[in-house]
């Protein structure tokens, strides 16, 4: 069993009164806000409970540990980002537009403007609480990279990009562009996908 599998992303369910889903949502939102402001090590479950209008015992009945709660908050964000994608499938787009859209979905801040701060915090916690980075890799980073790689593989198979295109390296470069932009304090991260495509596409496109 992996560390991620041991981290519970779903609230505990037990006998008694029906669950208050509005309270669950309030707790998740309070957790996400404090993660961005304070980081994993510094967040207080008492403060989260107070911000959500509940108590620590009520919080613990839902998520037995801080890690369980934070994983649940991350899972909520991953689902929300996926739900926010355009309804048109990438496979229905023209080759260049499909490449751009897949790059766009790599953006950690696609849905959550504070995502880069969270990523930095989780990387800083890699030795103390490696489960956090495991969750991010398995539920967010790897699936999004796999989607871009699948787009590139299809384009390569169809002869739209060069047969010697290193799909994995291209995907890694695209993902890394978001971190470099954040660290350089470039203002418009929303334009990254187009700029990266403008740079890489001419060297990838198949002759003829």
Swiss-Prot record:
GO MF annotations in UniProt: DNA-binding transcription factor activity; transcription cis-regulatory region binding
Annotated keywords: Cytoplasm, DNA-binding, Repressor, Transcription, Transcription regulation
SUPFAM superfamilies on file: Homeodomain-like, Tetracyclin repressor-like, C-terminal domain
Major subcellular location class: cytoplasm
PANTHER family: HTH-TYPE TRANSCRIPTIONAL REGULATOR RUTR, TETR-FAMILY TRANSCRIPTIONAL REGULATOR
Function: Transcriptional repressor that negatively regulates expression of the pnbBA operon, involved in the degradation of 4-nitrobenzoate, and its own expression. In the absence of 4-nitrobenzoate, binds specifically to the promoter region of the pnb locus, inhibiting its expression.
Subcellular location: Cytoplasm
Protein's recorded name: HTH-type transcriptional repressor PnbX
Induction: Negatively autoregulated. Transcription is induced by 4-nitrobenzoate.
Gene behind the chain: pnbX
Gene Ontology CC entries for this record: cytoplasm
Modulation of this protein's activity: 4-nitrobenzoate prevents the binding of PnbX to the pnb locus, leading to its expression. Other potential ligand molecules, including 3-nitrobenzoate, 2-nitrobenzoate, benzoate, protocatechuate, chloramphenicol and 4-hydroxylaminobenzoate, have no preventive effects on PnbX binding to the DNA.
Superkingdom of the organism of origin: Bacteria
């Amino acid at each position: 069993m992996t560390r991620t599998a041991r981290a519970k992303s779903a609230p505990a369910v037990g006998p008694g009164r029906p669950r208050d889903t509005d309270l669950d949502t309030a707790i998740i939102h309070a957790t996400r806000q404090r993660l961005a402001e304070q980081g994993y090590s510094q967040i207080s479950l008492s403060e989260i409970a107070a911000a959500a209008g509940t108590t620590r015992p009520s919080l613990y009945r839902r998520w037995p540990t801080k890690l369980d709660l934070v994983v649940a908050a991350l899972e909520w964000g991953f689902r929300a980002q996926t739900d926010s994608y355009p309804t048109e499938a990438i496979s229905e787009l023209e080759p260049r537009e499909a490449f751009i859209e897949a790059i766009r979905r790599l953006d950690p801040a696609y849905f959550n403007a504070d995502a880069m701060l969270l990523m930095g915090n989780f990387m800083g916690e890699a030795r103390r609480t490696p489960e956090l980075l495991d969750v991010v890799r398995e539920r967010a980073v790897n699936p999004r990279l796999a989607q871009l790689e699948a787009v590139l593989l299809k384009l390569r198979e169809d002869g739209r990009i060069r047969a010697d295109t290193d799909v994995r390296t291209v995907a890694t470069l695209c993902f890394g562009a978001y971190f470099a932009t954040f660290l350089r304090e470039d203002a418009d991260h929303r334009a990254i996908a187009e700029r990266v495509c403008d740079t890489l596409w001419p060297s990838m496109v198949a002759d003829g």
